[in-house]
């Protein structure tokens, strides 16, 4: 939280919680088991447990796990159908998995002394690049060269179309960057603010205010954890729609 400096003051280290460390000591290399890998594993286990337990017993009066699983299933199914149409439902399993992984990783990251994989650009950029590569390949496979019409704004004045095409191409290739930074940045910011409040809790005079701040921020972070997973998923659906229907 906060360490004592040589002069007697407190030094806050809100970014220390995001450091990637080796689980068994030593330097971090390509194949070193790290805290990131551990908590991504926990997130996958949480998703599997929730969906398996939630779908194992389909009772008339659903259990909590069944209610959560059915709610998540219906929520994402409707999102995919509304944005991408019936044709996009074949990608529902992938989008559902993506949403559940992100939301579970975000929620597990709210546990004290845990680690949040989605606060790292290295993790979120892989998720975003997977979406980008998938929709780009799908766009060309389904539409051929007609997919390039996505970048040609036919409704604009003829003189502006080449300029707008360049802007559209740049914005298309920036998608994975903005897609990943939005998620990692928001998650990191919230956790850093909580850590700062936790540091101030060590000061007697302001500790009551700091504790109230931590409580309020935790409540906000629960909401942000869901919203960021929702935003990432809905943007994935929008990009998928562009690949399926580039003319719309």
Swiss-Prot record:
* Family to which the UniProt record says this protein belongs: Belongs to the ATPase A chain family.
Per UniProt, subunit arrangement is: F-type ATPases have 2 components, CF(1) - the catalytic core - and CF(0) - the membrane proton channel. CF(1) has five subunits: alpha(3), beta(3), gamma(1), delta(1), epsilon(1). CF(0) has four main subunits: a, b, b' and c.
Please report the name of this protein according to its UniProt entry: ATP synthase subunit a
- CDD domains recorded for this chain? ATP-synt_Fo_a_6
Q: Could you list this entry's UniProt keywords, alphabetically sorted.
A: ATP synthesis, Cell inner membrane, Cell membrane, CF(0), Hydrogen ion transport, Ion transport, Membrane, Transmembrane, Transmembrane helix, Transport
> What functional role does this protein have?
Key component of the proton channel; it plays a direct role in the translocation of protons across the membrane.
Could you tell me which SUPFAM superfamilies the record lists for this protein? F1F0 ATP synthase subunit A
Task: Enumerate the Gene3D superfamilies for this protein.
Answer: ATP synthase, F0 complex, subunit A (1.20.120.220)
Question: According to its record, how does it sit in the membrane?
Answer: Multi-pass membrane protein
Q: Which residues cross the membrane?
A: 36-56, 91-111, 121-141, 147-167, 196-216, 220-240
Q: What is its main location?
A: membrane
Single GO MF annotation: proton-transporting ATP synthase activity, rotational mechanism
Sorted alphabetically, the Gene Ontology cellular component annotations on this record are: plasma membrane; proton-transporting ATP synthase complex
């Amino acid at each position: 939280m906060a360490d004592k400096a040589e002069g007697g003051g407190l030094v806050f280290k809100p970014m220390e919680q995001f450091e990637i460390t080796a689980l068994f000591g030593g330097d971090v290399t390509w194949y070193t088991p790290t805290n990131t890998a551990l908590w991504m594993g926990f997130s996958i286990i949480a998703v599997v447990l929730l969906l398996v337990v939630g779908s194992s017993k389909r009772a008339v009066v659903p259990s909590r796990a069944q209610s959560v699983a059915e709610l998540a299933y219906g929520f994402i199914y409707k999102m995919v159908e509304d944005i991408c149409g019936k044709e996009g439902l074949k990608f529902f399993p992938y989008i559902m998995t993506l949403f559940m992984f992100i939301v579970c990783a975000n929620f597990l990251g709210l546990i004290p002394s845990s680690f949040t994989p989605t606060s790292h650009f290295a993790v979120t950029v892989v998720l975003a690049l997977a979406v980008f590569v998938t929709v780009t390949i799908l766009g060309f496979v389904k539409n051929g060269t007609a997919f390039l019409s996505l970048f040609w704004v036919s409704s604009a004045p003829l003189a502006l179309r080449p300029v707008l095409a360049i802007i559209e191409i740049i914005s298309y290739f920036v998608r994975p960057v903005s897609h990943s930074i939005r998620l990692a940045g928001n998650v990191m910011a919230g956790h850093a603010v909580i850590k700062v409040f936790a540091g101030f809790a060590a000061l007697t005079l302001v500790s009551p205010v700091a504790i109230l701040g931590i409580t309020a921020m935790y409540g906000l972070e629960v909401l942000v954890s869901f919203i960021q997973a929702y935003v990432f998923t809905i943007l994935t659906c929008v990009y998928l729609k562009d690949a399926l229907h580039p003319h719309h």
